[in-house]
């Protein structure tokens, strides 16, 4: 179970990094960043449950990351919307 979850987290992290590097769209980039954050959350929760099942440090860390990612997504999409209104495009050039 541990290996499968860590491999899935690493795969999601790699997809997010490659999407973030190759993305030229202001809507796709935050989605790739969310994928990276979710991969970190998966690895944190799995590692926390494996190493010390009685402590919930990994789960608490994941909740904080989710809260920060939600705020980042809201701010990022509002900035993208404002730029779209001015430039009529969401491409990053």
UniProtKB/Swiss-Prot annotation:
Q: Which UniProt keywords apply?
A: Chloroplast, Membrane, NAD, NADP, Plastid, Plastoquinone, Quinone, Thylakoid, Translocase, Transmembrane, Transmembrane helix, Transport
Please cite one Gene Ontology biological process associated with this protein: photosynthesis, light reaction
User: What Pfam families does the record tag this protein with?
Assistant: Oxidored_q2
* UniProt GO cellular component terms: chloroplast thylakoid membrane; NADH dehydrogenase complex
Task: Identify the domain of life.
Answer: Eukaryota
Q: Its catalytic activity?
A: a plastoquinone + NADH + (n+1) H(+)(in) = a plastoquinol + NAD(+) + n H(+)(out); a plastoquinone + NADPH + (n+1) H(+)(in) = a plastoquinol + NADP(+) + n H(+)(out)
Q: Where are the transmembrane segments?
A: 1-21, 60-80
Q: Which Gene3D superfamilies match?
A: 1.10.287.3510
Look up the EC number in the record and give it.
7.1.1.-
Q: Coiled coil located at which positions? A: none
- Subunit comment: NDH is composed of at least 16 different subunits, 5 of which are encoded in the nucleus.
Give the protein family.
Belongs to the complex I subunit 4L family.
Give the protein's biological function. NDH shuttles electrons from NAD(P)H:plastoquinone, via FMN and iron-sulfur (Fe-S) centers, to quinones in the photosynthetic chain and possibly in a chloroplast respiratory chain. The immediate electron acceptor for the enzyme in this species is believed to be plastoquinone. Couples the redox reaction to proton translocation, and thus conserves the redox energy in a proton gradient.
Tell me what this protein is called: NAD(P)H-quinone oxidoreductase subunit 4L, chloroplastic
Q: Which organism is it from?
A: Anthoceros angustus (Hornwort)
Gene for this chain: ndhE
